[in-house]
From Swiss-Prot:
One GO cellular component term: ribonucleoprotein complex
Annotated family: Belongs to the orthobunyavirus nucleocapsid protein family.
Taxonomy, superkingdom: Viruses
Molecular function terms from GO: RNA binding
Pfam family, one: Bunya_nucleocap
Listed InterPro entries: Bunya_nucleocap (IPR001784), Bunya_nucleocap_C (IPR043011), Bunya_nucleocap_N (IPR043012)
Record key words, sorted: Capsid protein, Eukaryotic host gene expression shutoff by virus, Eukaryotic host translation shutoff by virus, Helical capsid protein, Host gene expression shutoff by virus, Host-virus interaction, Ribonucleoprotein, RNA-binding, Viral nucleoprotein, Virion
GO terms for biological process, alphabetical: symbiont-mediated suppression of host gene expression
Amino-acid positions noted as binding RNA in the UniProt annotation, renumbered to this chain: 15, 18, 47, 50, 75, 81, 94, 123, 125, 128, 166, 182-184, 217
Quaternary structure (record): Homotetramer. Binds the viral genomic RNA. Interacts with host PABP1.
Protein name as catalogued: Nucleoprotein
Length: 233
């Protein structure tokens, strides 16, 4: 006779992942020696990288970005999405957020000539396609990178504000805000900051709402070129 056996499983006690600790580990092990050109490749080729990962079943993959090699746990493949990711494990999403945080810190600490170089080399496709450029401010521009929501304090709630704005405009399903709504804000848990930081979120949303969003297929370099002829896009 067929016997079906079932065993009890422990209750889900929640994730132990701490983005701050994860970033520190990433910074120590993978950021020394990394260049802006290598980071540029990661973001410019982001969609291509994700598409490639989604078609490969391997759980552990190494990305070679212009000589910068970083290991990735392939959660982009449908069959891997329920795999447990260690606290210090690197997914595409985590790497994106870590690099965004690194770029913001680097930008704010640099001289004006170095900032100009960064603005030239680092392009955020998700911001650019909405007509948002570095001119909107580094915190805003870099907040469009996936994973920036892990650092709501560093990015002054802009990742959340961008998500709220997209939902209000019917450009994004509200369910995609769930991950952001679980994040901490400068060490404050979500249950607390959602009641004590409403003013800060509203201020961030006001900034984001006033950015003059517009869909465009023209790059920032092309817009700058055309502006020399009095053409604004």
């Amino acid at each position: 006779m067929l016997e079906l056996e079932f065993e009890d499983v422990p209750n889900n006690i929640g994730s132990t992942f701490d983005p701050e600790s994860g970033y520190t580990n990433f910074q120590r092990n993978y950021l020394p020696g990394v260049t802006l050109d290598q980071i540029r490749i990661f973001y410019i080729k982001g969609r291509e990288i994700k598409n490639s990962l989604s078609k490969r079943s391997e759980w552990e993959v190494t990305l070679n970005l212009g000589g910068w090699k970083v290991p990735v746990l392939n959660t982009n493949f449908p069959g891997n999405r329920n795999n447990a990711v260690p606290d210090y494990g690197l997914t595409f999403h985590r790497i994106s957020g870590y690099l965004a945080r690194y770029l913001l810190g680097k930008y704010l600490a640099e001289t004006e000539p170095e900032k100009l170089i960064m603005r030239t080399k680092i392009v955020n496709p998700l911001a650019e396609k909405n007509g948002i450029t570095w001119e909107s401010g580094p915190e805003v521009y870099l907040s469009f990178f996936p994973g920036a929501e892990m650092f709501l304090g560093t990015f002054r709630f802009y990742p959340l504000a961008i998500g709220i704005y997209k939902v209000q405009r019917k450009e994004m399903d509200p369910k995609f805000l769930e991950k952001t709504m679980r994040q901490r804000y400068l060490g404050i848990d979500a249950q607390t900051w959602t009641t004590t930081k409403l003013g800060e979120v509203e201020a961030a949303l006001k900034v984001v709402s006033g950015l003059g969003w517009k869909k465009t297929n023209v790059s920032s370099a092309a817009r700058e070129f055309l502006s020399k002829f009095g053409i604004r896009m």
